[in-house]
Amino acid sequence: MSRSLKKGPYVEASLLKKVEELNQKNEKRVIKTWSRRSTIFPQFVGHTFAVHDGRKHIPVYVTEDMVGHKLGEFAPTRTFKGHAGSEKSSRLR
């Protein structure tokens, strides 16, 4: 279920403040964040965020196509190592 339109998009206030300060200074710097739930605003385009995946911070460079999505969508939390190998192939060798 999506968020109510009357509420508007959510973004962590401290994250928005950091981006606004960097935009005023014309700086590009990696912004470390744990806020995976924050919506990507148009002001974020061109910035790199280090989004926490539960273990480490994944660098995410924001483009125009990402506006409206959440930061957490671009930093996967699960790593798939693959299914166990077939026992038949290991027995034949």
Swiss-Prot record:
Q: Name one GO molecular function term.
A: rRNA binding
Could you list this entry's UniProt keywords, alphabetically sorted: Ribonucleoprotein, Ribosomal protein, RNA-binding, rRNA-binding
Report the GO terms under cellular component: cytoplasm; small ribosomal subunit
Q: A GO BP term, please? A: translation
One matching Pfam family is Ribosomal_S19
Tell whether Ribosomal protein is among the UniProt keywords: yes
| InterPro entries (UniProt xref) | Ribosomal_uS19 (IPR002222), Ribosomal_uS19_bac-type (IPR005732), Ribosomal_uS19_CS (IPR020934), Ribosomal_uS19_SF (IPR023575)
Domain of life of the native organism: Bacteria
Q: Record keywords: Nucleotide-binding included? A: no
* SUPFAM superfamilies assigned to the protein according to its UniProt record, in alphabetical order: Ribosomal protein S19
HAMAP family, alphabetically?
Ribosomal_uS19
Write out the similarity annotation: Belongs to the universal ribosomal protein uS19 family.
Q: What does this protein do?
A: Protein S19 forms a complex with S13 that binds strongly to the 16S ribosomal RNA.
Question: What is the protein name for this chain?
Answer: Small ribosomal subunit protein uS19
This chain's source organism reads Heliobacterium modesticaldum (strain ATCC 51547 / Ice1)
